[in-house]
């Protein structure tokens, strides 16, 4: 009987990508098959996120639930990876001594040998080092699971925003070689992928070296990926305003495969708070970039990230954030109450804003962002949208679902499963809070 792998992933798209590569790696080297039940597993992997405090607490809660499984089956291997593992290293075993393997985002390629070593030696295996980007040299070709796929183009971040742990958990920015990324995209396209999302913590800072020694930026990469036969839609995330270049704006205007949607985190609408965050740009500079983009690509959808309650945030600072929201007109966006991350400069700042006030501000901000996002959805009613059909509807097996360019789920009646993995034109009939309803055009 084949041995089983259970994997749970917390956090961002980069973690989702890493988890998929771990599945590929362990499938090839140890013939592990994925199971949906942790209690059936021979190996349990937890790929963690440390962006927010509650995410970190969630790690230890989950490990605590698996303790009984380990006691019942001592041969089971429990491995913890991702950013919490990178940040805490061997200290994870202080709170969860039954964990066998601890590895970081840059050492996931060592998983097979670490698991084997844990079994043979009965000793914990810990490697949270930063061997730059060598992990990609040890990973098998990615398996294809549906018409959409993530492709990691770079690792780490060198911006060192004062609130963020990424430079400490994933290391400095390192771009994958241009031709390696292209080879992965070609492989995916040859196996039925129609849409790729190019990933990086600061993806528009991509600087990949080509086979002839030239340095290519993200705009160069997008143009070449768009020319790959079978790739009809390109997304990328996450971007930093500082490196949202004119060449990237030009690519948005000239490359039809690049979606009319941009996720560009701003975090705050207060220049004072942006400076304290070490974002190194102003709200005026942010809006200037977006004005230039919208002039080049009318109707493009803009989403963002917001942090509410950063240390020292005043009522005026928050009002400036709300003003920025009105000035820009965002699509559905992500927003959170600030939580201090150990080891970051912001964790040492005085935070005298009451938690109740932070939550009140967050509720007001989310309410307005949701209003703006729903208004964009409402304006789409009556339009014809080209969607990539991805799966059956989650609520009705007689319906299929797909995504628009601006990342909205569309559910529509259809009895032809062969449409999954293809593009289709759908008339938008109705806007709902978290999705759209449509009718397939024949």
Swiss-Prot record:
Pfam families registered for this protein in UniProt: Radical_SAM, TRAM, UPF0004
Positions contributing to [4Fe-4S] cluster 2 binding: 157, 161, 164
Residue ranges constituting the TRAM domain according to the UniProt record: 378-442
Subcellular locations according to the entry: Cytoplasm
Record's keyword terms, sorted: 4Fe-4S, Cytoplasm, Iron, Iron-sulfur, Metal-binding, S-adenosyl-L-methionine, Transferase, tRNA processing
Presence of keyword ATP-binding: no
A Gene Ontology cellular-component term: cytosol
Residues the entry annotates as binding [4Fe-4S] cluster 1: 12, 49, 83
Leader sequence segment: none
Domain of life: Bacteria
A GO term, aspect molecular function: 4 iron, 4 sulfur cluster binding
EC numbers for this chain: 2.8.4.3
Domain MTTase N-terminal: 3-120
Domain Radical SAM core: 143-375
Keyword Cytoplasm set for record: yes
Catalytic activity entry: N(6)-dimethylallyladenosine(37) in tRNA + (sulfur carrier)-SH + AH2 + 2 S-adenosyl-L-methionine = 2-methylsulfanyl-N(6)-dimethylallyladenosine(37) in tRNA + (sulfur carrier)-H + 5'-deoxyadenosine + L-methionine + A + S-adenosyl-L-homocysteine + 2 H(+)
Cofactor(s) needed for function: [4Fe-4S] cluster
CDD domains: Radical_SAM
Self-association state and partner proteins as the record states: Monomer.
Family: Belongs to the methylthiotransferase family. MiaB subfamily.
Known role: Catalyzes the methylthiolation of N6-(dimethylallyl)adenosine (i(6)A), leading to the formation of 2-methylthio-N6-(dimethylallyl)adenosine (ms(2)i(6)A) at position 37 in tRNAs that read codons beginning with uridine.
Name used for this protein in its record: tRNA-2-methylthio-N(6)-dimethylallyladenosine synthase
Species in which this protein is naturally found: Pseudomonas syringae pv. syringae (strain B728a)
């Amino acid at each position: 009987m084949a041995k089983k792998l259970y994997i749970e992933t917390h956090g961002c798209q980069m973690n989702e990508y890493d988890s998929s590569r771990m599945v590929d790696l362990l499938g090839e080297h140890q013939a592990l098959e994925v199971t949906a039940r942790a209690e059936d597993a021979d190996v349990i992997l937890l790929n963690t996120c440390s962006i927010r405090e509650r995410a970190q607490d969630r790690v230890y809660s989950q490990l605590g639930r698996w303790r009984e499984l380990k006691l019942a089956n001592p041969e089971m291997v429990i491995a913890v990876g991702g950013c919490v593992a990178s940040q805490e290293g061997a200290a994870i075993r202080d709170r969860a001594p039954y964990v066998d393997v601890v590895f970081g985002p840059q050492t996931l390629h060592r998983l097979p040998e670490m698991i084997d070593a844990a079994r043979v030696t009965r000793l914990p295996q810990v490697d949270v080092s930063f061997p730059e980007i060598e992990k990609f040299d040890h990973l098998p070709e990615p398996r294809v699971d549906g018409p959409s796929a993530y492709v990691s183009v770079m690792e780490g971040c060198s911006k060192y925003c004062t609130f963020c742990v990424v430079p400490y958990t994933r290391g400095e920015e390192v771009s994958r070689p241009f031709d390696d990324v292209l080879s992965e995209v070609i492989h995916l396209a040859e196996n039925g992928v129609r849409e790729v999302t190019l990933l990086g913590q600061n993806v528009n800072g991509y600087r990949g070296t080509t086979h002839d020694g030239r340095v290519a930026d993200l705009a160069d990469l997008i143009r070449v990926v768009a020319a790959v036969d079978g790739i009809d839609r390109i997304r990328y995330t996450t971007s930093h305003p500082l490196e949202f270049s004119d060449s990237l704006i030009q690519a948005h205007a000239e490359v039809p495969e690049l979606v009319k949607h941009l996720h560009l985190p701003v975090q705050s609408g207060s220049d004072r708070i942006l400076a304290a965050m070490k974002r190194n740009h102003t709200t005026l500079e942010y809006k200037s970039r977006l004005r230039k983009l919208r002039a080049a690509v009318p109707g493009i959808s803009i989403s963002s990230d917001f942090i509410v309650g950063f240390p020292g945030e005043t009522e005026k600072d928050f009002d400036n954030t709300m003003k920025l929201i009105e000035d820009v007109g965002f699509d559905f966006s992500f927003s959170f109450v600030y939580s201090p991350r150990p080891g970051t400069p912001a964790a040492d700042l005085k935070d005298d804003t009451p938690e109740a006030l932070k939550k009140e501000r967050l509720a007001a901000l989310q309410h307005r962002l949701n209003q703006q996002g729903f208004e964009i959805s409402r304006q789409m009613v009556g339009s014809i949208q080209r969607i990539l059909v991805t799966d059956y509807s989650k609520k009705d097996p007689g319906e299929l679902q797909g995504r628009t360019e601006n990342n909205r789920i569309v559910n529509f009646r259809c009895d032809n499963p062969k449409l999954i993995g293809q593009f289709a034109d759908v008339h938008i009939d109705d806007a709902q809070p978290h999705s759209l309803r449509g009718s397939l055009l024949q």
